[in-house]
UniProtKB/Swiss-Prot annotation:
InterPro entries: Apple, Pan_app, Peptidase_S1_PA, Peptidase_S1_PA_chymotrypsin, Peptidase_S1A, Trypsin_dom, TRYPSIN_HIS, TRYPSIN_SER. The active site is at H434, D483, S578. Disulfide bonds join C21-C104, C47-C77, C51-C57, C111-C194, C137-C166, C141-C147, C201-C284, C227-C256, C231-C237, C292-C375, C318-C347, C322-C328, C340-C345, C383-C503, C419-C435, C517-C584, C548-C563, C574-C602. Keywords: Blood coagulation, Disulfide bond, Fibrinolysis, Glycoprotein, Hemostasis, Hydrolase, Inflammatory response, Protease, Repeat, Secreted, Serine protease, Signal, Zymogen. The enzyme cleaves Lys-Arg and Arg-Ser bonds. It activates, in a reciprocal reaction, factor XII after its binding to a negatively charged surface. It also releases bradykinin from HMW kininogen and may also play a role in the renin-angiotensin system by converting prorenin into renin. The keyword Transport does not apply. It is an enzyme of class 3 (hydrolase). Belongs to the peptidase S1 family. Plasma kallikrein subfamily. This is Plasma kallikrein. Glycans are attached at N127, N215, N308, N396, N494. It catalyses: Cleaves selectively Arg-|-Xaa and Lys-|-Xaa bonds, including Lys-|-Arg and Arg-|-Ser bonds in (human) kininogen to release bradykinin. Inhibited by SERPINA5. The gene is Klkb1. GO terms for cellular component: extracellular space.
């Protein structure tokens, strides 16, 4: 535990307003007060991640640099809360502060790939193995049940006996117990949270069975599935036992025991009525739960500290209210006659120390449930459009089938469709940077949404104008990298059944395996063709990057790209489809997985299309959309 001495630094006049998604980091700034916990992290980004997953943390301060007398505080991550959502800022050189990402659905991810040269992340060393490089060391950690982080000593390390050795480590908190600078050492974290473990994924649920292994913690949960999710995101839980509300010992009813063992596997389950046991899903590659619980439990009362009371129409509205209230962790919606008025029934917003109810009782007239603040896509409620299923080899789409698709048209002597794009917000469209090669002038562009046929467009057809064009700063003409651009519209869109946004993926979706993917657009239906009048659609399989690279030996297919297409050809995006969406259905939602970018010809055999991988640009998208909105607010306030 790190203790921070209260020193009389200069206090800023600015308050920290915690409303909605706040991703900004404040340099040379420290939040005063509100201390919850202190840990060590290698950088501010990991500190922010830890704050996001802490049940009460709203703000954090990280010390990247400290005075010589305070070296024990360097790399200190101070997690904080505030009743008002604000804390005073003080100036401190080397400090970096920011907000939890609890309300930033697309940013929420436990995966952390960064490695840190020159740092020794210390913990309990439980395994030392010889490996040839840092990648092998990280893989070794990822495929070990107990490894949370590691340190690798290079061949230049000053102690010969440790050279090219990989030290696997863990701690009670899952974070380093201290961090020191050291030459020729490299540290990093396990990639289990990135769905890259090869351990395997036992998903068995054992009814009327209990594990008798070591308990690492316990929480109150309404069922075994919430228990399993909590186990999955706990740093030391490998399996669990949950006792139902019919368990004979009253004090253990609805108790979820989080467990571990030295071997990483549980002992054989013991037959026990009203007990349910199972495994953490941390090592799963495909089936990983989100760190949230969406089910609403009828006739159940979640007890906890009362945060606020309001009156609403329905348990789902109560859950939405809880989700939008950043400190709310769970809620009770009462249907008792004395708790109902004209405007609705009583919605009690609640919280606890660990984010779980302090007690669960049954038989009430009403419902209980959890905040959805840690659900990946909770901040895009309008993007949940359900649909019924450039395109070479495609078929005509139906009106409203792909409501996020837009046509980007240039108006010079005449008006022409040039590219596609995707609605991602009321004032934002995402497309390809190369669409603006030679035409980077916002005034000449028109954006049409909610249409099926290009021939429908007349002078009276509503269109949007560009207020701001944001092309990725690393994009270069005639290169395939960083082919992404944001369009800010002059006027916010009105959402209709024909014009709605597509869900954006989370950063954690980098390794998600998609099986139901489609491309859409008005582009050519053959290589030497012409723009189509009716929007085309085509289902298309994704191609692994390694296989795609073999087809394009003269180009580099990097992790910021994703490929799709049939081996035999015949279906692909083509000219006029650029900037349009590659969407995939995953966990019941359509997500924007790719942006049509480039390829060799159209629908050629063994020449898949190459798309910009959206999940790799989520930080950039959020940074640019938020900074633009902040600038607009500052301008309007001036």
């Amino acid at each position: 535990m790190i203790l921070f001495n209260r020193v009389g630094y200069f206090v800023s006049l600015f308050a920290t307003v915690s409303c909605g998604c706040m991703t900004q980091l404040y340099k040379n700034t420290f939040f005063r007060g509100g201390d919850l916990a202190a840990i060590y992290t290698p950088d501010a980004q990991y500190c922010q991640k830890m704050c996001t997953f802490h049940p009460r943390c709203l703000l954090f301060s990280f010390l990247a640099v400290t005075p010589p007398k305070e070296t024990n505080k360097r790399f200190g991550c101070f997690m904080k809360e505030s009743i008002t959502g604000t804390l005073p800022r003080i100036h401190r050189t080397g400090a970096i502060s920011g907000h939890s990402l609890k309300q930033c659905g697309h940013q929420i991810s436990a995966c952390h790939r960064d490695i840190y040269k020159g740092l020794d992340m210390r913990g309990s060393n439980f395994n030392i193995s010889k490996t040839d490089n840092i990648e092998e060391c990280q893989k070794l950690c990822t495929n070990n049940f107990h490894c949370q982080f590691f340190t690798y000593a290079t061949s230049a390390f000053y102690r010969p006996e440790y050279r090219k050795k990989c030290l696997l480590k863990h701690s009670a908190s899952g974070t380093p117990t201290s961090i020191k600078s050291a030459d020729n050492l490299v540290s990093g974290f396990s990639l289990k949270s990135c769905a890259l473990s090869e351990i395997g994924c036992p998903m068995d649920i054992f009814q009327h069975s209990a594990f008798a292994d070591l308990n690492v913690s316990q929480v109150i949960t309404p069922d075994a599935f919430v228990c399993r999710t909590i186990c999955t995101f706990h740093p030391n839980c490998l399996f669990f036992t949950f006792y139902t509300n019919e368990w004979e010992t009253e004090s253990q009813r609805n108790v979820c025991f989080l467990k571990t063992s030295k071997s990483g596997r549980p002992s054989p389950p013991i037959p026990q009525e009203n007990a349910i046991s199972g495994y953490s899903l941390l090592t799963c590659r495909k089936t990983r739960p989100e760190p949230c619980h969406s089910k609403i439990y009828s006739g159940v009362d979640f007890e906890g500290e009362e945060l606020n009371v309001t009156f609403v129409q329905g348990a789902d509205v109560c859950q939405e209210t809880c989700t939008k209230t950043i400190r709310c962790q769970f809620f009770i919606y009462s249907l008792l006659p004395q708790d109902c008025k004209e405007e609705g029934c009583k919605c009690s917003l609640r919280l606890s120390t660990d984010g779980s109810p302090t007690r669960i009782t049954y038989g009430m007239q009403g419902s209980s449930g959890y905040s959805l603040r840690l659900c990946k896509l909770v901040d895009s409620p309008d993007c949940t459009t359900k649909i019924n299923a450039r395109i070479v080899g495609g078929t005509n789409a139906s009106l409203g089938e792909w409501p996020w698709q837009v046509s980007l048209q240039v108006k010079l002597v005449s008006q022409t469709h040039l590219c596609g794009g995707s609605i991602i917000g009321r004032q934002w469209v995402l497309t390809a940077a190369h669409c603006f090669d030679g035409i980077p002038y916002p005034d000449v562009w028109r954006i049409y949404g909610g249409i099926l046929s290009l021939s429908e467009i007349t002078k009276e057809t509503p269109s949007s104008r560009i207020k701001e064009l944001i092309i990725h700063q690393e994009y270069k003409v005639s290169e395939g990298n960083y082919d992404i651009a944001l369009i800010k519209l002059q006027t916010p869109l009105n959402y209709t059944e024909f014009q709605k946004p597509i869900c954006l993926p989370s950063k954690a979706d980098t390794n998600t395996i998609y099986t139901n993917c489609w491309v859409t657009g008005w582009g050519y239906t053959k290589e030497q063709g012409e723009t189509q009048n009716i929007l085309q659609k085509a289902t298309i399989p994704l191609v692994p990057n390694e296989e795609c690279q073999k087809k394009y030996r003269d180009y580099v297919i990097n992790k910021q790209m994703i490929c799709a297409g049939y081996k035999e050809g015949g279906t692909d995006a083509c000219k006029g489809d650029s900037g349009g969406p590659l969407v995939c259905k995953h966990s019941g939602r359509w997500q924007l997985v790719g942006i049509t970018s480039w390829g060799e010809g159209c629908a050629r055999k063994d020449q898949p299309g190459v798309y910009t991988k959206v999940s790799e640009y989520m930080d950039w998208i959020l940074e640019k959309t938020q900074s633009s909105d902040v600038r607009a607010l500052e301008t309007s306030s001036a």
